Swiss-Prot record:
Subcellular localization(s) per the UniProt record: Cytoplasm
Protein name (record): Eukaryotic translation initiation factor 3 subunit A
Modified residues (Phosphoserine): S492, S584, S895, S949, S1038, S1159, S1233, S1310, S1336
Post-translational modification: Phosphorylated. Phosphorylation is enhanced upon serum stimulation.
Sequence repeats: 924-931, 932-941, 942-951, 953-962, 963-972, 973-982, 983-992, 993-1002, 1003-1012, 1013-1022, 1023-1032, 1033-1042, 1043-1052, 1053-1062, 1064-1073, 1074-1083, 1084-1093, 1094-1103, 1104-1113, 1114-1123, 1124-1133, 1134-1143
Region (Interaction with EIF3B): 664-835
Region (22 X 10 AA approximate tandem repeats of [DA]-[DE]-[ED]-R-[PLIGFSV]-[RPS]-[RW]-[RL]-[GNIHT]-[DGLPTAM]): 924-1143
Pfam families: eIF3a_PCI_TPR-like (PF22591), PCI (PF01399)
Family designation: Belongs to the eIF-3 subunit A family.
Organism listed in the record: Rattus norvegicus (Rat)
Molecular function terms, GO-annotated: mRNA binding; receptor tyrosine kinase binding; RNA binding; translation initiation factor activity
Length: 1354
């Protein structure tokens, strides 16, 4: 829509303006823009006149497509608002089209009969015919006037029907337009358009049935809709009958019957009567007299039943028509010889069944059936007397000589009733044919031969030719046995005795049978005669006996009938079951066969599809290649043709054919083309230069010649312009003078009216002054009142605003005070928390100082122990005889002032097997180094010494040097289970009071590898206090159990320590440098050996190789944990600084598992201050208890050493040929060896305690130095120091477990510094022994039961 039409009214006004000046097309365009506009889609009252004007213009201009589009747009606009407006517009549109068509028809003389299809007016034949024959002015006028308007009217009807279809709101309008369209077709005899209209209506009906779910869909179950559709179809049927379009009429009948079937209620009797009347006409016109008569029968019965006011004349007329229609049904069957030869019986039967369905009959009617119905319902009594006897003459009586004469009277009476009974005239020919046939049948039964002239005299209403044709048809179709002899002009009947009549032969009045029938039925007649004779011959008593026998049989049957009936039923049931079983088997077999066939077919289909796909691919490839080749050749050919069209190309390729050049390279041709283009370009430039010179010279000469001409023309034009200006100036002055004179005249004339005007104005003012003053006074009063009201309103509003402002300020003040109070409380809480953190820091520093003091004292004691161990090792090395060395050591030990005597303390249960010398030396020598390594591993190391260990010039203590005088790393008597052999007689490592169940294999009663006094949870990595990775009770058993609940191996955020034992493992490994996972087997892995029980884990290299390749030559550190380290495993930090642990762990393994489960709680920051305070108190109590237990353990250790020295003198020296060689003489299991001798465990336990003491000494010394360098810990370390767990782990364990482990090696010590520490340790140990002698000794005793469990008795 144009931008200047903001309202539809403006568009309508604009269109009317165009129409006033005779411009219909612009007016139509303006209104079209309005209808297409999306801005005005809501219906308004102005839309209807706009639409009417729009349709009027479309009719005037014959723009049917624009009218259709406008109607659809208007339907969308007003369908939901005002559907009545749409109906009015459509009716007005059709009325305009009809008026225009009628006007054109009056002006034209043409009847539009010669045009078959309005959609295709000019056919090639009509154009040629008009060119050949020529047309006058009237014909051309008719073609230009009437035909286009008729076509426009037809298109209008069709468009409106399409617009209104399947819309329940305009259903009445739809049927009215359809009926108008039928009248149009009938008026203008438009047969083609009638067929199209019927097809459209049929399509609309199918769409109604298909799209019944739409909101505006038509419900065919509605009686009103059904009546409207039936009415329209009856009009269609009537129009088809009037136009003699019987095929369309029959389709209309089928449509009407379909509508009847959709209806749940029976249609109205008037409608059915009209329907039967129309259908009877259709059947008669189609030549189907049988169904025509049947339809009249239905109409007759309907009228008798439903019509209450049926008169006697109407009843008589209907009965007469029914009688004549029934008797007019051909006696001969409808099937022809061609139908018999083509075996079209099925088609005929199906057709008759369909026709019977249209009449509501269950089966197709027959002539005999209709005659019987007519007699049964007593139709003959209502027939007129003149026709009443016709039934008896044709169907009952046998009188061939008078038959035609009687029938002739009836036919004459029918012919005399054209005005009263016009519909009876159509039955006369059929009645004549039936009369001739009945005459021939009766004559054949009487005469054997008859002359043709005699027969002609018996049939007076036909000539000889028609009679002969009737005779031939009767012989062909009615099984009439007749032969015509043209020589004698006679007819002979029944001459063929072998002739057999058909079953459908017509039946009529019968006198006697034909000779052929008598011969054919001779056996049947003989049988009937013999049966009668037999009845006569048989006497009565025989019949009586038969009757008695019959009664006996009946009695026996009645007696056994129930059983027999049950037997028959059972047999029937069995048969049915067997049939069902067989059917199921057959169905199953067929199903399997079908599935198998389908599977085979599927395989074949897939193979075929694959083959076709491959072939298609290959064909596609070949096609693409061919297309490429063709495109290439085409490109080459085009280039060559382009080149040859030029002069240079023609010269270059004049001797070469294009077909030969197609084999050349396109690049070569392109190069030729480029070369040729360059030459042409040069030639063109030269020609342009020459032409430029010519044009330049020519233009210069031309301009020189035209200069004087231009000057002369300028002078002439200047003179003309001057004359014109002077003339116009004179005219202007004259015009102004005339205007001034006229103005003066007007002034003089009007000046006489000035006084009258003033007087009128004065009177008017005087008259209206009082009115003005009164209105002014009223205005001032209203103004004062309004001013007062507004002032009051303003005062009230100000009061409300002040009140609202006061309450808002008061609320803001309260909110501000609450915020200040909350801020103050938060500051107080922060201040209290800050003071609490400072108090915790101070307490932590005090606790650290106490721990350092305790460590200093313990270090002095351990130095004494180390000094004593060193002296004992030197004495052991100096002595040659093992027995003398042990005696001297025992004497030295006695001289130290020990209070225990050897013989008194030496009991059988404490004595163990003689310990081998190399094992004692190994454990004593490697104890200090392992303690240092354990302590430094736990610390993780962040001082300068640990950082320096990463450098190549590593000065750490070598783990195993070449000059190491210790024994072999591992012997067959190694005390770890994973390294034991089957003959190991050592006792278990389990603590005496350890009540934990055995860990893994068999009856293994060993505890963990840790010290007996170590009650802390096990470690894995550095200070890992996590729960065990395997089962709850399995401490480092098999590498993974079935109930393993471990998480992922290692995550990015895993803060656990390295699995190889801490940060001091700098060995070259096959793992990545950042991979902190523990070794597969070794270090702290206490799992059993993967090899056999007799395998004591010898070196995987040769026995003589002592790990020199991985350890430095000066490495005197302890042995590797994975092979020959007999230290306790690092599953708990047993050598950390601090007081000694109690010897007996309260709670056992159950308490430990409970502590581990509860260790999965929240972090330490979530604990309340009361729990942290309780932790600090508990820490102090544990420190005091550790100090007491430390003194007791040292005393117990001294006791064991004295006992061991006493037993060493009786110990046999061991052959140390191979450090991995197992004992050959020991063959018992580890359980038997533990039972045989428990004393060896005491010796090994004492050695382990000594080595652990040395490690603790070095670790605490390094920890002190490390703390001095690091200073006080941060808050995160302090908070994590006191763990929220219930176990007795130390703060160092948790702190190091929280901190991510760092791969920094521990600080190393030189050999001189190590020796100084050994001497200090010996001195501290000696002083500690003197102090320990004053304390009471806790006596222990190891008892082993039958199952191998070891109990420690105090």
């Amino acid at each position: 829509m144009p931008a200047y039409f903001q309202r539809p009214e403006n568009a309508l006004k604009r269109a009317n303006e165009f129409l006033e000046v005779g411009k219909k097309q612009p007016a139509l365009d303006v209104l079209y823009d309005v209808m297409k506009s999306k801005k005005h889609r809501t219906w308004q009252k102005i839309h209807e006149p706009i639409m009417l004007k729009y349709l009027e213009l479309c009719v005037d201009l014959r723009k049917s497509h624009l009218a259709k589009e406008g109607l659809y747009q208007y339907k969308n606009i007003c369908q939901q608002v005002n559907i009545k407006s749409l109906e009015d517009v459509v009716r007005a549109y059709l009325k305009l089209a009809e008026e225009k068509t009628e006007a054109a028809k009056e002006e034209s003389q043409q009847m539009v009969l010669d045009i078959e299809d309005l959609d295709n007016i000019q056919t090639p034949e009509s154009v040629l015919l008009s060119a050949v024959s020529g047309e006058d002015t009237q014909d051309r006028t008719d073609r230009l006037l009437l035909t286009p308007w008729v076509k426009f009217l037809w298109e209008s009807y069709r468009q409106c029907l399409d617009l209104l279809r399947n819309n329940s709101r305009v259903e009445r309008l739809y049927h009215d337009i359809a009926q108008q369209a039928f009248k149009f077709c009938l008026q203008y005899t438009r047969k083609a358009e009638f067929r199209k209209l019927c097809d459209n209506l049929r399509m609309h009906l199918s769409q109604i049935q298909r799209h019944h779910n739409q909101s505006t869909a038509i419900n065919l179950n509605n009686p009103e809709s059904q009546s409207m559709h039936l009415e329209t179809r009856l009009v269609q049927l009537d129009s088809a009958i009037s136009m003699e379009l019987w095929q369309e009429a029959f389709k209309a009948v089928e449509d009407i019957h379909g509508l009847f079937s959709l209806s749940k209620k029976p249609p109205k009797p008037q409608l059915m009567a009209n329907y039967y009347n129309k259908v009877s006409t259709v059947f008669w016109k189609s030549g189907n007299a049988l169904f025509h008569a049947s339809t009249l029968h239905r109409l007759y019965h309907l009228s008798r039943e439903m019509r209450k006011n049926l008169t006697q004349d109407e009843m008589q007329r209907m009965s007469t028509r029914v009688l004549l229609a029934t008797l007019s049904i051909p006696i001969t069957p409808e099937r022809t010889d061609i139908a018999r030869l083509l075996d079209m019986d099925g088609i005929i039967v199906e057709k008759q069944r369909r026709l019977a369905t249209l009449l509501g009959l269950q089966a197709p009617p027959t002539r005999i059936g209709l005659i019987n119905d007519m007699v049964r319902f007593n139709v003959l009594q209502y027939v007129v007397p003149e026709v009443k006897d016709l039934y008896n003459w044709l169907e009952v009586e046998f009188n061939p000589l008078k038959l035609c004469e009687r029938v002739t009277k009836v036919l004459n009476w029918v012919r005399e009733q054209p005005e009263k009974e016009p519909e009876l005239q159509q039955y006369v020919p059929q009645l004549q044919n039936n009369t001739i046939l009945r005459l021939l049948q009766q004559v054949a039964q009487i005469y054997q031969s008859i002359e043709f002239s005699r027969l002609t005299s018996l049939v007076p209403f036909v000539d000889a030719f028609q009679l002969e044709r009737a005779i031939v048809d009767a012989a062909r179709h009615c099984d009439l046995q007749v032969r015509i002899d043209h020589t004698s002009r006679t007819l002979s009947f029944g001459s063929d005795l072998n002739y057999a009549t058909r079953e459908d032969a017509p039946i009529g009045p019968h006198l006697q049978s034909m000779p052929s029938e008598q011969i054919r039925n001779q056996l049947t007649a003989m049988s009937s005669v013999l049966a009668k004779a037999l009845e006569v011959i048989k006497p009565a008593h025989i019949l009586q006996e038969k009757e008695e026998q019959h009664q006996l049989a009946v009695t026996a049957y009645i007696k056994n009938s129930r059983k027999e009936h049950q037997r028959i039923l059972a047999r029937r049931q069995t048969i049915e079951e067997r049939k069902e079983r067989l059917e199921s088997l057959n169905i199953q077999r067929e199903k399997e066969e079908l599935e198998q066939r389908e599977a085979e077919l599927q395989k074949v289909r897939k193979a075929e599809e694959e083959r076709l796909r491959q072939e298609a691919k290959e064909r596609e490839k070949e096609r693409i290649l061919q297309e490429h080749e063709q495109i290439k050749k085409k490109t080459v050919r085009e280039r060559l043709e382009q080149i040859k069209k030029t002069e240079l190309g023609a010269k270059a390729f004049k001797d070469i054919d294009i077909e030969d050049l197609e084999e050349l390279d396109p690049d070569f041709i392109m190069a030729k083309q480029v070369e040729q283009l360059e030459k042409e370009k040069k030639e063109l430039q030269e020609r342009l230069k020459n032409q430029e010179k010519k044009i330049d010279y020519f233009e210069r000469a031309k301009r020189l010649e035209e200069i004087p001409l231009i000057k002369s023309a300028y002078e002439e034009q200047r003179v003309k312009d001057m004359d014109l200006w002077e003339q116009q100036e004179e005219e202007r002055i004259t015009t102004m003078q005339l205007e001034r004179e006229k103005a003066l005249e007007h002034k003089n004339r009007m000046s006489r009216m000035l006084e009258d005007r003033d007087l009128f104005v004065m009177r008017l003012k005087a008259a209206r002054q009082s009115v003005y003053e009164e209105k002014l006074k009223q205005f001032e009063e209203r103004l004062a009142e309004e001013r007062h009201n507004r002032l009051e309103e303003r005062k009230r509003q100000r009061k409300e605003e002040r009140k609202i402002t006061y309450y808002r300020e008061k609320e803001e003040e309260e909110q501000r005070r609450a915020e200040e109070q909350m801020l103050k409380e938060r500051e107080e809480r922060e201040r209290a928390e800050r003071a609490k953190r400072e108090e915790e820091l101070r307490e932590y520093q005090e606790r650290v100082k106490k721990l350092e003091e305790v460590e200093r004292k313990k270090r002095q004691r351990e130095l004494e122990i180390e000094e004593r161990e060193r002296r004992r090792e030197e004495e052991r090395r100096l002595g040659e005889d093992p027995l003398s060395r042990k005696d001297s050591r025992w004497g030295d030990r006695d001289s130290e002032g020990t209070w225990r005597k050897g013989p008194e303390a030496d009991s059988e249960w404490r004595r163990g097997p003689p310990e081998k010398e190399w094992r004692r030396e190994t454990r004593d020598d490697e104890r200090p180094h392992r303690r240092d390594e354990d302590r430094l591993r736990r610390l993780g190391g962040d001082d300068e010494e640990r950082e320096s260990s990463l450098r190549p010039d590593d000065d750490r203590i070598p783990r195993r040097g070449l000059d190491d005088d210790r024994g072999p790393r591992r012997g067959p008597d190694e005390d770890r289970f994973s390294r034991r052999g089957t003959d190991d007689d050592r006792p278990s490592w389990r603590n005496a009071d350890d009540d934990r169940p055995p860990r893994r294999i068999g009856d293994d009663d060993r505890g963990s590898w840790r010290h007996t006094d170590d009650d802390r949870p096990p470690r894995r990595g550095l200070d890992d206090d996590r729960p065990p990775r395997r089962g709850l009770d399995d401490e480092r058993g098999s590498w993974r159990t079935a109930e393993e609940d471990r998480g992922p191996r290692r995550g990015m955020d895993d803060d656990r320590g390295p699995r190889r034992g801490g940060a001091d493992d700098e060995r070259s490994s096959w793992r990545n440098a950042d991979d902190d996972r523990g070794p597969r087997r070794g270090m702290d892995d206490d799992r059993g050996p993967r090899r056999g029980l007799d395998d004591d884990r010898g070196p995987w290299r040769n026995a003589a190789e002592d790990r020199i390749s991985r350890r430095g030559a000066d490495d005197d550190r302890g042995p590797w944990r994975n092979m020959d380290d007999d230290r306790v495993p690092r599953r708990g930090d047993d050598a950390r600084p601090g007081p000694w642990r109690p010897f007996v762990k309260p709670g056992g393994w159950r308490e430990k598992e409970k502590a581990r489960e509860e260790s999965w709680g929240p972090p330490r920051e979530s604990r309340p201050p009361e729990e942290r305070e309780w932790d600090r108190d508990k820490e102090k109590d544990r420190d005091n208890q550790d100090r007491e237990e430390n003194d007791k353990d040292l005393e117990r250790d001294r006791d064991r050493e004295r006992d061991g020295d006493r037993e060493d003198r009786f110990r046999r020296p061991r052959d140390e040929g191979g450090w991995r060689r197992g004992p050959a003489e020991e063959s018992s299991s580890w359980r038997d060896s533990s039972r045989r001798d428990d004393r060896d465990r005491d010796d090994r336990r004492r050695d382990r305690d000594d080595r652990r003491d040395l490690r603790d000494l070095r670790d605490r010394r390094d920890l002190r130095d490390d703390r001095d360098r690091r200073g006080p810990p941060l808050r995160s370390e302090r908070e994590e120091a006191s763990s929220w767990r219930r176990t007795d782990d130390r703060k160092d364990d948790r702190t190091e477990e929280r901190d991510p482990p760092r791969r920094v090696p521990p600080p190393t010590l030189s050999r001189e510094r190590e020796r100084e520490r050994d001497r200090e340790g010996e001195k501290e140990k000696a002083s500690w022994r003197a102090e320990k002698d004053r304390e009471s000794l806790r006596r222990t005793k190891n008892e082993t039961d039958e199952d191998g469990w070891t109990t420690v008795r105090r």
